[in-house]
From Swiss-Prot:
One of its GO terms (molecular function) is arylformamidase activity. The N-terminus is blocked. One of its GO terms (biological process) is 'de novo' NAD biosynthetic process from L-tryptophan. The keyword Zinc does not apply. The active site is at S162, D247, H279. The main chain amide nitrogen atoms of the second glycine and its adjacent residue in the HGGXW motif define the oxyanion hole, and stabilize the oxyanion that forms during the nucleophilic attack by the catalytic serine during substrate cleavage. Changing D247A: Loss of enzyme activity. This is Kynurenine formamidase. Changing H279A: Loss of enzyme activity. It catalyses: N-formyl-L-kynurenine + H2O = L-kynurenine + formate + H(+). Homodimer. Its EC number is 3.5.1.9. Disruption phenotype: Mice display sclerosis of kidney glomeruli, possibly due to failures in the elimination of toxic metabolites.
């Protein structure tokens, strides 16, 4: 299959040295609130504590299988009040497709369930066990599973961070007829994501992934939005592309260009830079109801109801 090719002018990353490219795609090197060598550990600790609190204080169903694979599990957290019709918020963790877990990713559970939203944290097989193609398939099937499990839902809102934002963006390209169900997708929130994977091939991030050029091109939503027919999701389904002020320039470029492509091909897209946050605390802060991103999520969900 031939993939859309972009010129060097359209790909400014081609002008970067290998050292600069490595820096641009190393989020920990751009943080300002903590030491680069400590930020990932802090992120995992905050996520683990939030998950432990959510499991202790919210009704939940853990390790629900959405497929036959060992890694195909998800955690479901419920509001206090019982209801057969509720919005579903699905979160896909980051970690460059090679780290991270649903077991340390329930940052937003307490603030969102307090407002009547069911929160689902999805696991997928990270590298080296899982390939990008497998991860995309797993995430897509998790959405199908939840639509079938909760057919009366008031909307599915898919949110991903970093690598998870990439996987969520790939769901925009899903062919639902293949799965025999059209999910009630009502919103996408793509946080600090990567939408063209080719720049990563020459970085250390690719060591566990072992991505080839074809792998990267096939799994780059930036390259397929305008060549794949519009999918059967709600015409007014918003796609919010968000990036932290202190994400790297390459993360900013990728987010802005993906937003512009979304607009060009007819999606209801918006772009927002969140001030004062980096690649990590943009998600860490979701433990707070008064956080900017928490409020964006609530507004996105409830303005649709």
């Amino acid at each position: 299959m031939a993939f859309p090719s972009l010129s060097a002018g359209q790909n400014p990353w081609r002008n970067l040295s290998s050292e600069e490219l490595e820096k641009q795609y190393s989020p920990s090197r751009w943080v300002i609130h903590t030491k680069p060598e400590e930020v990932v550990g802090n992120f995992v600790q905050i996520g683990s504590q939030a998950t432990q609190k959510a499991r202790a204080t919210r009704r939940n169903q853990l390790d629900v299988p959405y497929g036959d694979g060992e890694g195909e599990k998800l955690d479901i957290y419920f509001p206090d009040e019982d209801s057969k019709a509720f919005p579903l918020f699905l979160f896909l963790h980051g970690g460059y497709w090679q780290s991270g877990s649903k077991d340390d990713s329930a940052f937003m559970v307490n603030p969102l369930t307090a407002q009547g939203i069911v929160v689902v944290i999805v696991a997928y097989d990270i590298a080296p066990k899982g390939t990008l193609d497998q991860m995309v398939d797993q995430v897509t099937r998790s959405v199908v599973f939840l639509q079938r499990r909760y057919p009366s839902n008031e909307g599915i809102y898919l949110c991903g961070h970093s690598a998870g934002a990439h996987l969520a963006a790939m769901v925009l390209l899903a062919r639902w007829t293949k799965h025999g169900v059209t999910p009630n997708l009502q919103g996408f929130l793509l946080v600090s994501g990567i939408y063209d994977l080719e720049p990563l091939i020459a970085t250390s991030q690719n060591d566990p992934l072992r991505m080839t050029l074809e792998d990267a091109q096939r799994n780059s939503p930036q390259r397929h939005l305008d060549v794949v027919p519009a999918q059967p999701v709600a015409p007014a389904c918003p796609v919010l592309v968000l990036v932290g002020q202190h994400d790297s320039p390459e993360f900013h470029r990728q987010s802005k260009e993906f937003y512009e492509t979304l607009l060009r091909v007819g999606w209801k897209a918006s772009f927002q830079q969140l001030r004062g946050v980096d690649h990590f605390d943009i998600i860490e802060n979701l433990t707070r109801e008064d956080d900017v991103l928490t409020q964006i999520i609530l507004k996105t969900v409830f303005q649709k109801l």
